[in-house]
Amino acid sequence: MSVLEPGCGMGYFTLPIARMTGPEGRVVAVDLQAKMIEGLVRRARRAGLLERIEAIVCDDSDLGFTDRAGLIDIALAIHVLHEVRDQQRFLEQVFDALRPGGRLLILEPKGHVPREKLDGELALAERVGFHRIAEAVHRRSHGALLEKPA
């Protein structure tokens, strides 16, 4: 399984995801901040998971994974989309990276992103080509699971 995690930070979700994907799995972890990627790499090395993680420093106009078109099974945008300057470009790049039938989980913090803003983000994702397949609600987060049509 291949997982894309844009906005990975120091790997709060990255390391558990790498464990779950197993030895054959791959996590492509992307962040704007080199210091975050450096911290992620250190933590992954200590945990013995570095071989399962590809850590990429990107910029805000290019996520740095265009060479993976159609190769990603699932992407996780956890508490990140509201921080992205060009959300359409971001969603288009994620869409292109996903294989047909691949999924994107968008979660946003309830206390920071009101439902109306989330609805706008999800509508934009649908305009890019995603289909909404389920609502995702957690005590502190809300979002949706989306799918790239097969």
Positions of the model-derived regions?
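Conserved SAM-binding strand-loop segment of SAM-dependent methyltransferases
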Residues: 49-60
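A short SAM/SAH-binding and catalytic strip from SAM-dependent methyltransferases
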Residues: 72-85
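Conserved beta-strand signature within the Rossmann-like core of class I S-adenosyl-L-methionine
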Residues: 101-108
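A short glycine-rich, Lys/Arg-flanked "PGG" loop and its adjoining helix->strand segment in the class I
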Residues: 19, 88-100
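Conserved SAM/SAH-binding beta-strand->alpha-helix loop
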Residues: 33
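A short acidic, Gly/Pro-enriched loop at the edge of an enzyme's catalytic core
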Residues: 1, 61-75
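Conserved class I S-adenosyl-L-methionine
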Residues: 1-9
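Conserved SAM-binding loop of SAM-dependent methyltransferases across substrates and taxa
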Residues: 10-22
